[in-house]
Amino acid sequence: MFWHLLCVPNDENASAPDDGNQSCQPSSKQDQYLSPNRNCQKNLLRLYPPPPSKPPPLVGAILQTRLLHQISPSAIADADADLNAVGELLYPNVLQRSATLPAKHNRLGVRSRVTFKVPSSNLPAQDSYSHQPRNQVAVAAKDGILVDVKAKESVKMTSEDLLQPGHVVKERWKVVRKIGGGGFGEIYEGQDLITREQVALKVESARQPKQVLKMEVAVLKKLQGKEHVCRFIGCGRNDRFNYVVMQLQGKNLAELRRAQPRGAFSLSTTLRLGLQILKAIESIHSVGFLHRDIKPSNFSVGRLPYNCRRVYMLDFGLARQYTTGTGEVRCPRAAAGFRGTVRYASINAHRNREMGRHDDLWSLFYMLVEFVNGQLPWRKIKDKEQVGLTKEKYDHRILLKHLPSDLKQFLEHIQSLTYGDRPDYAMLIGLFERCMKRRGVKESDPYDWEKVDSTAIGNISATGNPSIPIKSDYMHGNITQMTVAASNASGTEYIRKRAEIETAHITATDPLNIKEKVDKNCNATSLAQPAKGSGEPMVQHGNAANNQNITSKGLQQQSTLTNSQVAIANIQSAPSMIEREDVQYTKLEEGAPTKFITMKPNGECDNVDIAAKCIFEQKHVEANDDIVGRASLSGVEQHYKSQIKKHNSPEIANKQIQRTGTVTNDKTSEVNRSTEEQKSTFGRLRVLTAPPMSVHDLPSGGGHSHQVSDLSGKQDPYAATSNAAPIGINSSSTKFGSQHGQIFGLAAMPPINRRSATSTNLRPSSSASQRINSGSTIGGAVGNGSNTARSSVAGDHSVTQFALIDDENVSALQQVTKGGALTLASQWKSQFDDSEDTTDNEWNREHQLQPNLEQLIKLDISLPLNEAKPFPQHGVAGTGKLINPPGEAKGRPKRYTLNITGIENYEALRISIPNCWSEPAMGNVLRKGLEPPAVQQAAFDDTVYRMDIARNVCVRETYSEITHLARPSTSSVLRNRLPSPFKKDSALQLNSTNDSLDKSRHRNSLPNVSVNDIFDDLQMKLNLDLGSAIQENNCCISGRLEIRVIPKDTSHPDDSVYYDAMGAVKNTPTANEGHDHSDQAVNNCDEMEATSAVIAFPNKSISKIMSPPGRDATEERTGASLCSLYSAGVNKLKLNGNTAPRTQFKKGSTDGFGENESEFDFPLLNPSKIPVRQSKCASWAGADFISASKPLESAEVPQEIPYHPQSDTTYSVIDSIPVRKTTYSIALECPPNISDLTPGLSYFYCNIVVPLRLFSILLTES
């Protein structure tokens, strides 16, 4: 795989002439040995590490050469020739460059350099290759083979990770970086794409024999709601791995202890920690589980302001349930095996006995001793059995020497317990509280890691020496530090060597009047004195935004970039290569006067903030003004404001641009530093607790007040363009002056991956403080200069940052657990206990590539504020989208709760309406004064349900109660109900105006809903005589429709379960009169379905229609079909709420059901057998039912046609519809109970059968 290259001028050759004849000064001894006569080219290609996938192409050839060396010395010449041939084949134009490769698993951390041939596109092949000595390839092959093997192993480790940065688990959790790994799985920091909070993903391979996440999930779920247990978010599994997602925590107690000056906690901190751990142990015991791996690294503090003083229990992989299903203690096993960590394990665990509740308390006791004393007597012992013997023989009362005497009672209590005994938690908790009360310890007192060691700061200020030998390694003067905002980008840990273990590198507070150098990119950097000695870190003051190669022995170069775009490309491409012996700090002028960036071997920067939790002021700064990210500290702010203005002036910037390079040796740098110190006054920082600040308090601009209209043609020389400027600013300091995203026209560029100098992987602070790039715009679009404030849900506040601490003890059965805890910034060790020659050996993490910059953009997309308005009119920042200006927000589709036309005009109503209509409550009356859209209606045929959408209550009404109905023409009513033979009669051909025809066509085209006031018709008067009957008998019947498949041969009339819906009706007058041809007619009426008349005809009206006595079967069919047509016509009139259609029925036209033609020459329907449920049935079809016990006189009749005697004609069928007084059918006299019918039968019966039967009666009597 080709190695990634970046075309930038070489820093080492910045001042060299263009002819390339002068030789470059080597950056290290190894480099000088490898290429003593290396010529300088005008444009050298900087080599960076590749993505962790495959070794470089030439490594294979180098390995082949090495093998040939071992096989035959005579093959060396041929191997060199083959190697050159391979190089020429792969790279037509090559340059030879040496690069530093990480030495994986090298305990001393030595980093070697190896020479590779890399392509060059701007130089001829013969020129570039002719400058290189031929024998250097063999030198590279000899010296680089061992390094490449280790690089290969590093690549292998990374490629075998279960997850990679950028992966999304379950379409919800995006992997940010790996923060731990071991024999039981891997731990990643991730981001919840829904809530935007940082989470921890614990992953184990599905193929490993020992599955522990199942127990982890079980215990974690049981413990939810407990005070000292982190929140469980989710879990799952696939064919590759199992995973559990939980709340991300901060530093563990092992790291916090080692960060202290003497490696121990004060008694005040120890007592309060012991009390919290005791309560956590009691909580897990209360749910029936033992932890069995109590140790400092399995307890961490929270990382948010509200929980940063709370201790959380982690890692339940070794937990065991000690109770049975009934709550009794399980019987102990004879040989249970060792579980836990050797240093903190109880004597029972060393004896392989079954562990009980008291064994967790033994581990707590050992933790308390280590907290106060700094170590345990058996710390140096490596053998587990030897540690167990030591614990048995050791007088534990000696361990209480520096502990309160009251804790002797704690020791005596746990010594008296056995496996099945329950500890007296209340007594032990009271013991700790009594000790705290006697010593005046308050819960609000600051913990040791929250304090500032003023003595250490004074020593730093007095000496100005960046390295002071102190016991703990990589601590910073016992100073609480602010978390780096952008330090979560990559996962490579800093590798310490043995020479650094006993030396603490404490960064000094710079003199206030040190003059910064301003390079051509307007990045102010200050000079400092480099450290002496090969093993000590050297403070380099280069350009923080340029990730340059810096030589190891005192050479300090300023990067000379031709334009700003090259600088940005340099940042984005790859990390720089640095010597292993160097720890390079770059002064951060913009953030605070005590902030340094550590340039790590992979080019990442560590923010070392001396004054932790400093409150940064927010100041609005106009464009072309000075930087705004300043510490609000007395004496510092005014000085730096003037300094920044001075050094960011165009004159100085132009001078810097004219320079081709700056080379400073040790002596010059030291003299300059001493000169500045004579004139300097040292500022001491006051550490304050960072207030939990809400993003709602921030200005809408989010600190980015620069309005950039032309990105490409205008560059602001006054704005701070350093990427390193805001990385240490917490949520309390969200004002940045860094506008590089807009100034350089690369709005989508994320910040540089940064890490603390303690080599800890710290997650970003919640606001990422509006992120470095202004607006987080995507695609290079011009933002409006303001960043959407992050919601409080996504506000992650990281308050503390501490020195690098390793968990030197590995739990049993956990080969490499790295502490096994979901600690955010922890490193986990791989050795069993302490190493042979040092007590602080560490686990070397695999080299991980910096994640893609495009993926980083999506990490910290700001969420919109949770405004009170549910539908803001302005644009809402979506994931990866630019905030739309108000003009563009109008084109965005609006969000509706319910699809109601015009609801957007009712702001208050829109908030209260539900998301959907689901099972509304049926009532009798609605609130008065409701108007649309507060009231909606759903129409089902002639029944309308009016609904109060705010309260989800509806009432059932008929069409006539809510609509304005016109007086129907008698001719239209008649024509809609007469068969076609009658329509042809000239006496029935009444005049029908074109207006009525147009209205009828319009009505037929309307949907099946009730519409108000479509025509300007007069409201019909309701029949007051029938109103009482309607109100008395109109009721809602609930039920359900059941459809069953039944065999065809079960149509026996005596069947008690199934009834023939079209069965014969006996004893009716029609059947008695015409037995020869009445079957076809009466088949349309079933006596089972007869009901009290819904529509009853009076005697005088029925007698007005004369029918020939000698009618045939066809006429009987016609009469039966006429009933169906009549029902259809009535249905039309009801469902639309106006007059019935007045159109003449033509051939081929359909009625309201779309089935029956008006020319009634069609066969009768086949009988359908539908089961009848002896229960209530629904009236969804819209028919109005009454009980069978009611008299026929109280039957409900239609109200739309009032009685007008003066308009009666000879051919008027439906002139008046009074209450029916007499019956003409035996079936109608004894109707069945409507409640016995299914909804389908109810609909068929009420709308078809009854009108059909009535009309047949009409024909019979006539």
Curated annotation (Swiss-Prot):
It comes from the Eukaryota. Residues 20-35, 755-776 have a biased composition (Polar residues). The keyword Cell cycle does not apply. Residues 173-436 form the Protein kinase domain. GO terms for molecular function: ATP binding; protein serine kinase activity; protein serine/threonine kinase activity. Coiled coil: none annotated. Its EC number is 2.7.11.1. Residues 13-35, 662-724, 755-792, 984-1003 are annotated as: Disordered. SUPFAM superfamilies: Protein kinase-like (PK-like). ATP binds at residues 179-187, 202. It is found in: Cytoplasm, Cytoskeleton, Spindle; Cytoplasm. GO terms for cellular component: cytoplasm; nucleus; spindle. It catalyses: L-seryl-[protein] + ATP = O-phospho-L-seryl-[protein] + ADP + H(+); L-threonyl-[protein] + ATP = O-phospho-L-threonyl-[protein] + ADP + H(+). Keywords: ATP-binding, Cytoplasm, Cytoskeleton, Kinase, Nucleotide-binding, Serine/threonine-protein kinase, Transferase. Disruption phenotype: Embryonic lethal. Detected in larval brain. Its cofactor is Mg(2+). Its main location: cytoplasm. Disulfide bonds: none annotated. GO terms for biological process: signal transduction. Residues 667-679 have a biased composition (Basic and acidic residues). Probable serine/threonine protein kinase. Belongs to the protein kinase superfamily. CK1 Ser/Thr protein kinase family. Interacts with Mgtor. This is Tau-tubulin kinase homolog Asator.
